[in-house]
Amino acid sequence: MSKPPPKPVKPGQVKVFRALYTFEPRTPDELYFEEGDILYIADMSDTNWWKGTCKGKTGLIPSNYVAEQAESIDNPLHEAAKRGNLSWLRECLENRVGVNGLDKAGSTALYWGCHGGHKDVVDMLLAQPNIELNQQNKLGDTALHAAAWKGYADIVELLLVKGARTDLRNNEKKLALDMATNAQCASLLKKKQAQGIVRTSSNADEYLDDEDSD
């Protein structure tokens, strides 16, 4: 029995597959790929021929071939971040895989990069212009919660420099500081929170007479 066809791509959304077999093109427009290659499908508007990219080359792929001879990768950016696979992460971003996509747990790729302590992955994700730093997953945890819980002070520092919020509580009402498992992480978070308190009080004095203030 053949598998049901994959759901069509929404505009701006990229579907990712891993080829199970090598495909030999019959025309110059078709895309050559080998078993195990990652395929990025950006255009499924033609039901018979999908436009895809593999190893930086773009071409047409028969849709029935992808449906039957390739396995769908639902959250490729998350997988790359979990594994600390920087080259795959870069390829996903170059092929416009959404940087803030959520997996079934409601977590972002940034969360998993922080959870795994993959500093180079976190660096690359934080360099994306529209990265969402403070996304909370189904447990209410942010990337900062994950880094603090796992004790990665270097990643905690990266997130704080980028502007991650320290005041978000998870479903257990815990701040990232409450989950910090080592003194270095706790110290960084306490320092940041103290700065926030000082800034808030000084702003109140500074803008007391400002009509634009809330």
Swiss-Prot record:
InterPro entries linked: Ankyrin_rpt, Ankyrin_rpt-contain_sf, SH3-like_dom_sf, SH3_domain
UniProt ANK repeat ranges: 72-101, 105-135, 139-168
Chief site of localization: cytoplasm
Annotated protein name in UniProt: Osteoclast-stimulating factor 1
Domain of life per record: Eukaryota
Compartments reported by the entry: Cytoplasm
SMART domains membership: ANK (SM00248), SH3 (SM00326)
UniProt organism field: Xenopus laevis (African clawed frog)
